[in-house]
C-alpha cells in the first residue's frame, strides 16, 4: 500500500506507551488519523502532520513507484533542485524515534539522489533539528538548509553579541541555502547546541516582548505546536519592524556562507 497502516506496522496494531514516547512527534499522542476505506471500515494510518499530509510508505512497491514517478516528473518539467520536505520522518522503525533513522535514511536518500541525477537534477533534504544532522548531510555532499542562522542572528542583534554567530560561520556547511524566515516561521530547535539553553530562552522572550505582530498563543499546543519548535512570524516582525535592523540582517545573510534564500512574504 501507499500508506502506513498501524495494524501492519505495530506488533499489536497500536504502539505501546514506551514506543509512543520514543517517537519524535509533533502531537502529544501517537501520530495517526483514523482513515475510512471504501468498504466503510476504519483504520489508523500514520500521520505526522495534518490530515491532508498522510505519511507515505517508503518500504512498499507502491511507495517506491510513487516516489520515483514524482521525482522524474518534477525533473522532466524543469526542476533542477528538488526539495524533500520533512525528509527525516520518511523512515520508520518500531522502537526508534522514527526520525532520521540511520542507516536506513541514507539508503532512501541515495535512492532519491540516484533517480534525480538520472534526470539531471539534485535533491535538497529539508530537516529541522540539531545542526549535526546538516553537517552529516554536508559530509556526504548533499545540499542542506541553514535553519540555525535566523535565531543566531536575532540573538546577535538583540544582545549585541556575535560570539555564537561567528562560531557557526566557522563550522557551518558551505553547500547550503541560508534563510532568515520561511513559511514555517523561525526555527528554535535548530540552534540547540549552538546557543546555550538560557540564551535561547532569552532570545525567545525578547522576541515575544519586542517583536511586532508576534503572539505566544500561535506557538502553543492549541495551534499544534507541542513545543516551541518554530516561532510563527516574519523576520521583519521579529526585529520589531525596524528597517535598519532588517537591512543589517539581510546584508549579513547575503555575505554568510551559502546561497541566500529570501522568503517573499518576509520582504
Model regions and ranges:
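Active-site and adjacent substrate-binding regions of carbohydrate-active enzymes
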Residues: 1-267
Amino acid at each position: 500500500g501507499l500508506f502506513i497502516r498501524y495494524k501492519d506496522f505495530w506488533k499489536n496494531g497500536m504502539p505501546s506507551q514506551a514506543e509512543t514516547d520514543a517517537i519524535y512527534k509533533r502531537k502529544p499522542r501517537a501520530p495517526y488519523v483514523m482513515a475510512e476505506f471504501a468498504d466503510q471500515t476504519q483504520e489508523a494510518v500514520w500521520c505526522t502532520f495534518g490530515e491532508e499530509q498522510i505519511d507515505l510508505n517508503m518500504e512498499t512497491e507502491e511507495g517506491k513507484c510513487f516516489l520515483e514517478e514524482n521525482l522524474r516528473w518534477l525533473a522532466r518539467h524543469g526542476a533542477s533542485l528538488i526539495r524533500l520536505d520533512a525528509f527525516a520522518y520518511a523512515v520508520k522503525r518500531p522502537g526508534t524515534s522514527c526520525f532520521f533513522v540511520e542507516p536506513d535514511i541514507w539508503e532512501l536518500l541515495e535512492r532519491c539522489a540516484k533517480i534525480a541525477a538520472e534526470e539531471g537534477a539534485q535533491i535538497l533534504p529539508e530537516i529541522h533539528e540539531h545542526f549535526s544532522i546538516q553537517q552529516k548531510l554536508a559530509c556526504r555532499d548533499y545540499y542542506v538548509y541553514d535553519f540555525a542562522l535566523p535565531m543566531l542572528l536575532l540573538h546577535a542583534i538583540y544582545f549585541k553579541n556575535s560570539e555564537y554567530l561567528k562560531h557557526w560561520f566557522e563550522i557551518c556547511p558551505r553547500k547550503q541555502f541560508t534563510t532568515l524566515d520561511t513559511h514555517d516561521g523561525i526555527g528554535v530547535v535548530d540552534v540547540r547546541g549552538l546557543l546555550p539553553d538560557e540564551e535561547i530562552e532569552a532570545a525567545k522572550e525578547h522576541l515575544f516582548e519586542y517583536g511586532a505582530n508576534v503572539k505566544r498563543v500561535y506557538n502553543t499546543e492549541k495551534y499544534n505546536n507541542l513545543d516551541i519548535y518554530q516561532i510563527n512570524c516574519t523576520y521583519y516582525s521579529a526585529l520589531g519592524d525596524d528597517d535598519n535592523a532588517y537591512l543589517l540582517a539581510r546584508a549579513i545573510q547575503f555575505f554568510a556562507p551559502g546561497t541566500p534564500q529570501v522568503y517573499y512574504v518576509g520582504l
